[in-house]
Amino acid sequence: MPSYMRLCYGKGLRNLLIFFTPEPASFEQLILVHSPTYVRQFLSLTLPQREAIRIGFQQSEQLVRREVSLVGGTLQGAQYALENGCAFNIAGGTHHAFSNRG
């Protein structure tokens, strides 16, 4: 069980929270914020070295899966909040996007 889930359950919130594994954000969703060129390079692990260094993480399939899942979770959480009044992404807050870089 992930640490945030254990923390929430330990605080007696088990019956108040719904945890879900998000669907990864699609290419179409990602290019609503980032340029198509940047997204293609990120997804194919072909970012220029300078940009990869700026992000601060080594390019890898694991990083791509993590980031598109985080974005997907934020989008799904926002939709849930619109429908139900409240939501939060326990993995969010680490992504600060610009159109042409991470």
Segments the model singles out, each with a brief description of its role:
Residues 1-102:
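HDAC/HDAC-like amidohydrolase catalytic core signature
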